[in-house]
């Protein structure tokens, strides 16, 4: 069993107003339901849960601070806190490795605010049903609205509309595409955030592409 770590009293639980619009299914959804309240209490937001067959079984929990940052120390705090909860709830059969990570630069887009925050950058979007004759889209995020996002294709192909409005409730998966512009913008945002922080804050670390803890074997 992993030692339980209590949230620091100075941490502010995350508000639930900006809930995820893309959610897990199956065992991933079960795990998300267990860990999301714990992660929120620590002052972080859950991005994604994914159980894969990597190294036997690997449970990846992706999280971030409300400002989009996540350091190795943050990942370790989340790991130490959720591990004992998972031990008690025991949602996964067999042994598995627990990995806590940041979203990285080419991050998944799981909230409405993610689309507006990264407007102007290229994303890949998949829908749960056929929309405008297809289920896969790629293009620049033009604007994120209350109930939809508009994508302008950067690779126009015959028969496909160059600009498509996609309702959020149809999106099953979405993530940013790694480009030079995205890297520059991500580093610029990270620098601005660090300069605005109180000196000594543990978030004043080097920008992280994908900060993560070492995986720990469970059971």
UniProtKB/Swiss-Prot annotation:
Locations listed in the record: Cytoplasm
Its GO biological process annotations read: ribosomal small subunit assembly; translation
Task: Report residue spans for region: Disordered.
Answer: 195-219
Question: Where does the UniProt entry say this protein principally localizes?
Answer: cytoplasm
The membrane-spanning stretches of this chain are: none
Keywords per UniProt:
Cytoplasm, Ribosome biogenesis
What Pfam families does its record include?
Answer: DUF150_C, RimP_N
**Listed GO CC annotations:** cytosol
Protein origin, superkingdom:
Bacteria
For this protein, the record's InterPro entries field holds: Ribosome_maturation_RimP (IPR003728), RimP_C (IPR028998), RimP_C_sf (IPR036847), RimP_N (IPR028989), RimP_N_sf (IPR035956)
| PANTHER family named among the record's database cross-references | RIBOSOME MATURATION FACTOR RIMP
Q: What does this protein do?
A: Required for maturation of 30S ribosomal subunits.
User: What family classification does the UniProt entry report for this protein?
Assistant: Belongs to the RimP family.
The record's section on NCBIfam families has: PRK00092.2-5
Question: What protein does this entry describe?
Answer: Ribosome maturation factor RimP
């Amino acid at each position: 069993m992993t030692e339980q770590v209590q949230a620091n009293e100075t941490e502010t639980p995350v508000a639930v107003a900006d809930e995820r619009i893309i959610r897990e299914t199956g065992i991933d959804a079960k795990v998300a339901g267990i860990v999301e309240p714990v992660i929120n209490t620590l002052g972080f937001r859950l991005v994604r849960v994914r159980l894969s067959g990597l190294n036997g079984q690997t449970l990846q929990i992706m999280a971030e601070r409300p400002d989009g940052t996540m350091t190795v120390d943050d990942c370790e705090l989340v790991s130490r806190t959720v591990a004992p909860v998972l031990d008690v709830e025991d949602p996964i059969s067999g042994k598995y490795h627990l990995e806590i990570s940041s979203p990285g630069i080419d991050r998944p887009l799981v909230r409405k605010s993610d689309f507006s925050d990264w407007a102007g950058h290229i994303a890949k979007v998949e829908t749960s049903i056929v929309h405008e004759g297809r289920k896969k889209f790629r293009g620049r995020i033009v604007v994120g609205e209350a109930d939809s996002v508009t994508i302008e294709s950067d690779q126009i192909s015959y028969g496909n509309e160059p600009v498509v409005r996609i309702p959020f409730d149809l999106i099953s998966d979405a993530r940013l595409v790694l480009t030079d512009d995205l890297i520059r913008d991500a580093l610029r945002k990270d620098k601005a955030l660090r300069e605005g922080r109180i000196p000594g804050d543990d978030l004043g670390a080097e920008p992280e592409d994908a900060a993560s803890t070492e995986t720990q074997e469970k059971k």
